[in-house]
Curated annotation (Swiss-Prot):
Listed Basic and acidic residues bias regions: 171-199
Lineage: Eukaryota, Metazoa, Ecdysozoa, Arthropoda, Hexapoda
Function, as annotated: Catalyzes the covalent attachment of ubiquitin to other proteins. Acts as an essential factor of the anaphase promoting complex/cyclosome (APC/C), a cell cycle-regulated ubiquitin ligase that controls progression through mitosis. Acts by specifically elongating polyubiquitin chains initiated by the E2 enzyme vih/UbcH10 on APC/C substrates, enhancing the degradation of APC/C substrates by the proteasome and promoting mitotic exit.
SMART domains in UniProt: UBCc
The keyword ATP-binding appears for this protein: yes
Name of the protein in its database record: Ubiquitin-conjugating enzyme E2 S
Top-level taxon of origin: Eukaryota
Species, as recorded: Drosophila ananassae (Fruit fly)
Pathway: Protein modification; protein ubiquitination
Length: 209
């Protein structure tokens, strides 16, 4: 899912400065519900935490997303992935995100902030017509209650704050870099409490079945 190498050396100094400036602005004045995670050693590897929007099955969850800039950025769009597992029509099994902004509607003057806001909006209004997860797309259209319950359960299992804090800053899999170790032990007590809450919620859901 992630690139094996950095594209920093392939980007123009102007593009690097532009990306760093935008990331620093978002760090200072973050968009509502979005926290950018800056990797100063590789601006082509951008991660952010997105709060699940209220009133959706993703509410109360925190989702880690990753943008990977290619050497032709901003002439071509970055790749976008959910590193946090999620049940959503427009997110593939490998986490890749399908949204028109990153495909046919891409424009070079669209910035990182716009992309992250678009991804957040996708949590509010999924597009089942261009589903990468066909099961989720069909369920959303035909059995919304089942879709909502499935998405909510995935959120409770995978998108809790402690899990996001423990996620790898470089990748969702086998990255043992300094950032991973730095976050891996955060808030163990909070994580234990979330596990207890999840078990109680599962019991309640089983009773309703």
């Amino acid at each position: 899912m992630s690139s094996q190498y950095s594209n920093v050396e392939n980007l123009s100094p102007q593009t690097i400065r532009q990306v760093m400036r935008e990331l620093q602005e978002m760090e200072t004045t973050p968009p509502e519900g979005i926290k950018v995670l800056i990797n100063e050693s590789d601006v082509t590897d951008i991660q952010a935490l997105i709060d699940g929007p209220a009133g959706t099955p993703y509410a109360a969850g925190i989702f880690r997303v990753k943008l990977t800039l290619n050497k032709d950025f901003p002439q071509t769009p970055p790749k976008a992935y959910f590193l946090t597992k999620i049940f959503h029509p427009n997110v593939a099994a490998n986490g890749e995100i399908c949204v028109n902004t990153l495909k046919k509607d891409w424009k070079p003057d669209l910035g990182i902030k716009h992309i992250l806001l678009t991804i957040k909006c996708l949590l509010i209004v999924p597009n089942p017509e261009s589903a990468l997860n066909e099961e989720a797309g069909k369920m959303l259209l035909e059995r919304y209650d089942d879709y909502s319950q499935r998405a909510r359960m995935m959120t409770e299992i995978h998108a809790q704050p402690a899990k996001c804090a423990a996620g790898a800053a470089g990748d969702s899999k086998d990255d043992d870099g300094p950032s991973t170790k730095k976050h891996a032990g955060l808030d163990k007590k909070l994580q234990d409490k979330k596990k207890e809450k999840l078990l109680k919620e599962k019991k309640r859901m089983l009773k309703r079945l």
